[in-house]
Design a protein with these regions (language model features):
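A Zn2+-metalloprotease active-site environment signal
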Residues: 1-182
Length: 182
């Protein structure tokens, strides 16, 4: 039977080792990032969610607007790859399977890019972007989140929080899990 102090020593040592090995550096900003989860796993999950969105959401039948979105996206893809090549860095989008959809919803003024390059634009944002340049700015912003691997960071932080909560629960003899929620 392991005592609590020994548990904390082992857990703390393992946690520190894991955190140090999971630290990486963002290629452009040189900001430190925590990446505990494999990107391929997150990309796979995102692709499944994206396919579900495509099946359950009303997609726009405006082929001209969708084509414009795809052309802008293609130019951004090329720009990202060219930039990383120009600074001799590995292209973080090399394994992306880019795909674009236009969701028919004029009330939602948004766009998003999932890990792996799955991009959705809501028709509602088009009245705000006004033209190709405005749309490119919005799409570039969303794609930048995927390029910077923000989803991997968020998922890693959530994992740390869950593991930390479980460890505290073990250390406190179940005080967290036995707390009644109102």
């Amino acid at each position: 039977n392991i005592n609590r102090r020994k548990f904390l020593e082992i857990f703390g040592g393992c946690t520190c080792s894991l955190m140090i090995s999971a630290c990486s550096t963002a290629p452009i900003t040189q900001r430190k990032q925590l990446k505990l989860l494999p990107e391929t796993s997150l990309n796979r999950q995102a692709a499944q969610i994206y396919e579900n969105v495509k099946m359950k959401t009303k997609l726009s039948d405006d082929k001209k607007q969708l084509q414009e979105i795809k052309e802008i996206g293609s130019r951004i893809e090329e720009a990202v790859s060219a930039y990383f090549a120009s600074v001799n860095l590995k292209d973080p989008t090399y394994n992306f399977q880019w795909d674009y959809i236009l969701i028919d919803n004029d009330k939602i003024k948004n766009a998003w890019c999932m890990p792996g390059g799955k991009i959705a634009v809501y028709s509602g944002i088009l009245e705000i972007t006004k033209n190709k340049d405005g749309l490119a700015a919005v799409m570039g912003h969303e794609i930048a989140h995927a390029v910077a691997k923000h989803s991997v960071e968020r998922a890693s932080r959530a994992l740390v929080l869950n593991v930390g909560t479980a460890a505290i629960d073990i250390f406190t003899g179940g005080a967290i899990s036995n707390t009644k929620r109102t």
